[in-house]
């Protein structure tokens, strides 16, 4: 168990095997199967839940492993142990923690400043700001920015194969400029965004460009030493999109600079979301605002509770246990619904 290993004193190093290229890799591949080096267990999913319906073996692989160790007298004791385990919130299938190279934002460098700025925000209830959110800030870790997915904003980072040279692209204009250098150097045949006009903000012009992964991954840039540079394959955490909303909605800094720089539209006077956003939108807004502008992203915030179903579970579309609020209002009226919510909630 990775968590137990990391918490041990001294820390237990991860178990790795060497792949065909001699690189140390985990025992399990990215599909959740044991690697070929694992002999009789190779190709088996580490969790029965990963199999298609009707394909899972009678004994899961962890049971097979336990039996093998006991049979070969290599285990002191084998017993069942009931414990909590993280599941995917979309599929309800078990999650595997997998060691991958990632890009991080060094939030820990501004952790104290984030806490200072949070004390200037008017939280309702105050306990959420000083307690749940405040404690989250005090224990904030560096932000894992990259995601190994297909849909999302691509990391605008191009690197040489040896990783010694890299470039971070900050605008389409800069990307087109670098593509021209790449074409001139012969590492690209053409500028794939040649028809796009810099400075033309019309929809017609932006129909000529596509910045999604399947397109930008075709772009090869050239380093200062003349080496080809490929884009880092990962995407950006979607919470970074949400946290950038105050500036991105105005196409800042390419347009409407005064709205942000002169505080016409920033920071927000008021925002409201559920208490679960202390680790989501509230946090990403605050983190980016602190790092980019040394400012709060919002002055006042109302953090409401969550509506639970009859079994005490949070209502959600995924679980299908939500009550249509408009049908409730139509049947009982707004005042009766308000009174019901207030009288059945903690003060």
Regions found by a protein language model. Name each.
Residues 1-280, 284-347:
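Non-cofactor substrate-recognition interfaces
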């Amino acid at each position: 168990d990775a968590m137990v290993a990391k918490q041990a004193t001294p820390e237990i190093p991860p178990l790795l095997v060497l792949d065909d290229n001699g690189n140390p890799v985990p025992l399990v591949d990215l599909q959740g199967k044991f690697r070929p080096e694992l002999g009789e267990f190779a190709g088996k999913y580490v969790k029965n839940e990963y199999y298609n319906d009707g394909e899972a073996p009678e004994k899961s692989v962890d049971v097979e492993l336990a039996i093998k160790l006991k049979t070969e007298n290599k285990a002191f004791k084998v017993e069942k142990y009931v414990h909590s385990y993280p599941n995917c919130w979309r599929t309800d299938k078990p999650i595997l923690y997998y060691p991958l190279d990632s890009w991080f934002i060094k939030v820990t460098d501004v952790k104290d400043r984030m806490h200072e700025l949070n004390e200037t925000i008017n939280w309702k209830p105050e306990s959420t700001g000083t307690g749940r959110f405040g404690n989250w800030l005090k224990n904030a870790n560096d932000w894992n920015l990259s995601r190994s997915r297909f849909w999302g904003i691509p990391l605008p980072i191009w690197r040489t194969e040896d990783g010694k040279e890299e470039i971070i692209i900050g605008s389409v204009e800069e990307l087109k400029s670098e593509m021209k250098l790449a074409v001139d150097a012969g590492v690209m045949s053409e500028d794939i965004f040649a028809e796009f006009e810099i400075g033309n903000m019309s929809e017609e012009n932006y129909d000529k460009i596509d910045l999604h992964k399947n397109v930008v991954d075709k772009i090869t840039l050239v380093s200062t030493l003349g080496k080809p540079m490929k884009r880092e394959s990962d995407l950006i955490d979607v919470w970074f999109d949400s946290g950038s909303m105050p500036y991105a909605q105005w196409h800042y800094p390419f347009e409407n600079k005064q709205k942000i720089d002169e505080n016409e539209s920033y920071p927000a006077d008021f925002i409201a979301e559920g208490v679960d956003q202390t680790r989501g939108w509230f946090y990403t807004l605050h983190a980016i605002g602190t790092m980019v502008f040394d400012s709060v992203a919002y002055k006042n915030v109302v953090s409401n509770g969550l509506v639970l179903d009859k079994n005490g579970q949070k209502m959600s579309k995924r679980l299908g246990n939500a009550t249509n609020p408009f049908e409730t209002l139509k049947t009982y009226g707004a005042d009766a619904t308000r009174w019901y919510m207030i009288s059945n909630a903690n003060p």
